[in-house]
Structure formats: structure tokens, C-alpha cells
């Protein structure tokens, strides 16, 4: 990855609330399936905004911080009718590998992400922000606030 896109908590909240608006009316949804781990954060915001209390998870491992590896389904939420009436939420669709596995598990769910890269954008039903394919996203939950020394030292 040659570029980085740093997401602050404020940006994340704003983008996720925008995504939530697109999911109204809330009464059409039975619940949310959050893709662990990155989808847990936007799922919490969407659940709050839409008043949804039923939250399931699907746990898929494919990243080791900044390297994508083999896909491994660790846990899949058991919902009826291919996820009909559920919103599947992830933070990002990148290459589409995870998204394809999600689509197989929940073909009738509404699949949304906050961010999308070109290789996977067509695999989700909605997203808010386009990200170039060669860009690494630094999510706020992966960062900490630290002291940065001034440029001019005395």
C-alpha cells in the first residue's frame, strides 16, 4: 500500500450516521450482523441510530494488521432465510474476498460498509466513502493519541 487514509473518530461517526440515514425506516430490519472486528464499530453506531437491539456477529479473519491473508470463518451468525431483514455491517470492502464469503452466508441481507475500494465496491449494497485501491485505511480504533515533538527543537 503506497498511501494512507487516516480516519478520526469524528469522521467515522459522521460517515456512519450518514450510512444509517440510508437504512431508514428502521422498522424494516430484524437486526444487524456485525462483521468482526472492523464491523463492530459501525454496527454499534447504526444500532444506536436505528434503535436496533438484536445484534449478531460473523467472525472472519483475513488480515494481520496490514497484510491480507487466507480467509477463515471462525463463527457465522445463524439467521433464517439467508439473512433476510438483516443488515450486514463492515467497516470496509477491500479486495472483495470477505464480501464474497459474506454474500454466500447471507445472500438476502442488506450488506453495507462505511468505506469501499474499487475491487470490492460492487459486492456491497451501499457505502459512504470511496477509497483508492492502493490506500491503507488507519481506523481510529487501531490508533492511539500520542505526543508528537515540535518540528523546531531548541
Curated annotation (Swiss-Prot):
The Gene Ontology biological process annotation of the record reads: GMP salvage; IMP salvage; purine ribonucleoside salvage; XMP salvage
Q: Where does this protein hold guanine?
A: 94, 137
Is tRNA-binding among the key words of this record?
A: no
Q: Where does Mg(2+) bind?
A: 91
User: Which residues are recorded as binding GMP?
Assistant: 94-98, 136-137
CDD domains, sorted: PRTases_typeI (cd06223)
Q: What membrane topology does the annotation report for this chain? A: Peripheral membrane protein
Question: What is a GO molecular function of this protein?
Answer: guanine phosphoribosyltransferase activity
The UniProt entry's GO CC annotations, sorted and at most eight, read: cytosol; plasma membrane
Cellular location(s): Cell inner membrane
Catalytic activity, EC:
2.4.2.-, 2.4.2.22
Classification via PROSITE patterns = PUR_PYR_PR_TRANSFER
Partners and quaternary state?
Answer: Homotetramer.
List the PANTHER family: XANTHINE PHOSPHORIBOSYLTRANSFERASE, XANTHINE-GUANINE PHOSPHORIBOSYLTRANSFERASE
- Family stated for the protein in its record: Belongs to the purine/pyrimidine phosphoribosyltransferase family. XGPT subfamily.
Instruction: Name it.
Output: Xanthine-guanine phosphoribosyltransferase
This chain's source organism reads Histophilus somni (strain 2336) (Haemophilus somnus)
| Organism placement in taxonomy | Bacteria, Pseudomonadati, Pseudomonadota, Gammaproteobacteria, Pasteurellales
Gene name per UniProt: gpt
Amino acid at each position: 500500500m503506497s498511501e494512507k487514509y487516516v480516519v478520526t473518530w469524528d469522521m467515522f461517526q459522521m460517515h456512519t450516521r450518514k450510512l444509517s440515514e440510508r437504512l431508514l425506516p428502521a422498522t424494516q430490519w430484524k437486526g444487524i450482523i456485525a462483521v468482526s472486528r472492523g464491523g463492530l464499530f459501525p454496527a454499534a453506531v447504526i444500532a444506536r441510530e436505528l434503535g436496533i437491539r438484536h445484534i449478531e456477529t460473523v467472525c472472519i479473519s483475513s488480515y494481520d494488521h496490514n497484510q491480507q491473508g487466507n480467509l477463515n470463518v471462525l463463527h457465522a451468525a445463524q439467521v433464517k432465510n439467508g439473512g433476510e431483514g438483516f443488515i450486514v455491517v463492515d467497516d470496509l470492502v477491500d479486495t472483495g474476498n470477505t464480501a464474497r464469503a459474506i454474500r454466500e452466508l447471507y445472500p438476502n441481507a442488506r450488506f453495507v460498509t462505511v468505506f469501499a475500494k474499487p475491487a470490492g465496491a460492487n459486492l456491497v449494497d451501499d457505502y459512504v466513502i470511496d477509497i483508492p485501491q492502493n490506500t491503507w485505511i488507519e481506523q481510529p480504533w487501531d490508533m492511539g493519541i500520542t505526543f508528537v515533538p515540535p518540528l523546531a527543537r531548541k
